[in-house]
Amino acid sequence: MKEFKSFYKEVKGNEGSKCLYNKRLDTYGCGCQHDCSYCYAKSLLDFRKLWNAKTPAVASLDRIEKKIERLPVGTVVRLGGMTDCFQPIEKQERVTRGTIMLLNKYGIHYLIVTKSDLIVEYMDILDKELAHIQISTTWIPAEKAVSTERRIQAIETLYDAGFDVSVRLSPYIPQYVDFERLNSIRCNKIIVEFLRVNHWIRKWLPLDYSEYTLKQSGYCHLPLVKKIEYLAMVTGFEELSVCEDVDAHYLYWKDIVNHNKEDCCNLRMKEE
């Protein structure tokens, strides 16, 4: 199995300036077995022949520990920034499980972003003060991740157990959402991220892109007025936030919409 050596990154630029948690740790890289048609990481790596969905590279736990032990206590690390840390390969490699145990050991917060319900099997090691979980819900056809219903069940299981968990509607494509089911999920928090489109995503994902008329940083986006219209269809959550890439839209959500104006991920953080 090929080793994934560039497992840690501090995100810079446009994305890094907007995201409060720009430290990213990927336990698997250069491919993801979910192989989503709308994945921006895939769109960046596939044309360079660096994307291998069937056999992702695997990070070394020894190298991961050397990085984690140097991080200040209270740091928040995002698990699953470029690839899903709970993709099927985790069942055999268990690098994510080992990484979580190391993060617990060194007192490092971790933000898990996943499309898998495998995380429920790890509830025995998740630290309720350090673990922050976002499970992505999508109803896009032919996805290779587990069914949306299984993901919803995982959200509700974690929520009922008292974990800091959010529904992550990412990407939010209204044409592919079961709003009745979405708005009935037993969870108090949701994070919405609208689709951003480039050439490769147009090629892979069948969709009417005529509304994606706003261009920024190499991507096409919905205009703000359309985003506001579609966001009104998301109801039933006490705390709503929008994860945004477009500069002017980011300021609008921050000032007008987001539950936590300083943290669009809206993590439940205790005072250190």
Segments (PLM) and residue ranges:
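N-terminal [4Fe-4S]-dependent radical SAM core
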Residues: M1-K67, P72-V76
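Compositionally biased, intrinsically disordered low-complexity regions enriched in proline and serine
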Residues: K9, C39-A41, M123, D160, ...
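The N-terminal extracellular segments of secreted preproproteins, especially immediately downstream
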Residues: K18, G31, R186, D263-C264
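Pocket-edge structural micro-motifs
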Residues: G29, Y40, G80-G81, I135, ...
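A broad, structural surface signal
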Residues: H34-S37, M101, M233
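Short linear sequence elements within intrinsically disordered, low-complexity coil regions
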Residues: S43, V177, D255-N258
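Conserved AdoMet/S-adenosylmethionine-binding subsite of the radical SAM
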Residues: I64-L231
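C-terminal accessory extensions appended to soluble enzyme cores
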Residues: N198-E272
